[in-house]
Amino acid sequence: MQIQMLLPLVQTLAQQVADQEHLDLVSVQWLTHQSPPILRVEVRHPENDTSLEDCERLSRALEMALDELPEFEFAYVLEVSSPGLSDYLSSDRDFDAFRGFPVRVTTTAPHRGKTLWEGNLIRRDEVNVYLNQRGRSLAIPRSLIASVQLYTPSSEP
């Protein structure tokens, strides 16, 4: 069985272990260009900064669970870490945490004639991302959005 085909199984197991350890699972990926292959798992604490102890706890529990699976009869390296702070927003948690912060939205196609929008993040729902631009609300369809990134506005003299 190819290692990449095990990814759904690993994601499910990692989610169960993360839930037991009261952590949020951020991502699971195989780095198969390494020998042995690396299983990289990123987690974050839902309320506090993610500690080394959080990562160690999850690593031990996940390693024990993986060792029980007959599909894991091969050598691999398990890496568990925190994703750190990215300046790109992607999850609901990111959008909630950075409400009111200045963001730069890039679209894949023009929206109202532009592909780059800046403003303070109001919120995101199922359909749109909302920005405050000088006191006016702007809705940008999520279907057009390529990225939403935190940025520091330059001060104008």
From Swiss-Prot:
Annotated compartments: Cytoplasm
GO cellular component, one term: cytosol
Chain segments annotated as coiled-coil in the UniProt record: none
Any one of the GO BP annotations: ribosomal small subunit assembly
Pfam families according to UniProt: RimP_N
Keywords from the UniProt entry: Cytoplasm, Ribosome biogenesis
Main localisation: cytoplasm
Record function comment: Required for maturation of 30S ribosomal subunits.
Membership in a protein family: Belongs to the RimP family.
NCBIfam families: PRK00092.3-3
UniProt protein name: Ribosome maturation factor RimP
Organism in which the protein naturally occurs: Thermosynechococcus vestitus (strain NIES-2133 / IAM M-273 / BP-1)
